[in-house]
Amino acid sequence: MRPSKRAADAMRDVTLERAVARYAEGSCLVTFGNTRVLCTASLEERGPPWLRGSGKGWVTAEYAMLPRATHERTRREVNSGKPSGRTQEIQRLIGRSLRAVTNLPALGERQITVDCDVIQADGGTRTASITGAWVALHDCFAWMRARSIISVDPLKDHVAAVSCGIYKGQPVLDLDYAEDSAAETDANFVVTGKGGIVEVQGTAEMEPFTDEQFLELLRLAKGGVAGLVELQRKAIA
């Protein structure tokens, strides 16, 4: 049995609260159970230097954890001089996921930076970040359209993400920290609203997993993301 007593295919309670940051063009507070992430989308009227003259915009992301988001205080990475390898990996993943569903030429030569700040971590911070970041980005684009900065919505589709794993021999959906820390296999799936796969990250922590187990994890993930996309649709309605 899972520590949370959830069924194998059951997500934690998920909420998406919009317009939580007064000054950001778009914002969302996302919760996956006890994991809470503040996502803010900020418009910059200048794109990255390497895109100047291309007529194309850019969407990027930054990720950070507050010092007491974890059980014990974690030092701020700024004090070490640079982001950790884990932080860089996660923020690149968030950026790739958002760009996969964004029509970049529709932005013009502008950049949107989505900041994902983990307030409380209980597993799945990167998947919660991607899911909430999409809502913040959506609202940023709506803000831009309302002010005639852009004429069309650059978003091509929804995107959301969920973790899956093998816990005590059973494939399960949306691992919390208790499961994640003891899982035999841990995987993250980023999937669009139409079911396209953006990225899969999977690691066997103890024993290698089989093709059949991987396909079951994929099935669980697609079901979980379908539910997350429906929550996104309701949130922006």
Curated annotation (Swiss-Prot):
Reaction(s) catalysed (UniProt annotation): tRNA(n+1) + phosphate = tRNA(n) + a ribonucleoside 5'-diphosphate
GO molecular function: 3'-5'-RNA exonuclease activity; tRNA binding; tRNA nucleotidyltransferase activity
InterPro entries: ExoRNase_PH_dom1 (IPR001247), ExoRNase_PH_dom2 (IPR015847), ExoRNase_PH_dom2_sf (IPR036345), PNPase/RNase_PH_dom_sf (IPR027408), Ribosomal_Su5_D2-typ_SF (IPR020568), RNase_PH (IPR050080), RNase_PH_bac-type (IPR002381), RNase_PH_CS (IPR018336)
Residue numbers binding phosphate: R86, G124, T125, R126
CDD domains in the record: RNase_PH_bact
UniProtKB keywords: Nucleotidyltransferase, RNA-binding, rRNA processing, Transferase, tRNA processing, tRNA-binding
Top enzyme category: transferase
Family, as annotated: Belongs to the RNase PH family.
Function: Phosphorolytic 3'-5' exoribonuclease that plays an important role in tRNA 3'-end maturation. Removes nucleotide residues following the 3'-CCA terminus of tRNAs; can also add nucleotides to the ends of RNA molecules by using nucleoside diphosphates as substrates, but this may not be physiologically important. Probably plays a role in initiation of 16S rRNA degradation (leading to ribosome degradation) during starvation.
PANTHER family found in the cross-reference section: EXOSOME COMPLEX COMPONENT, EXOSOME COMPLEX COMPONENT RRP41
Name by which UniProt lists this protein: Ribonuclease PH
Upper taxonomic lineage: Bacteria, Pseudomonadati, Pseudomonadota, Alphaproteobacteria, Hyphomicrobiales
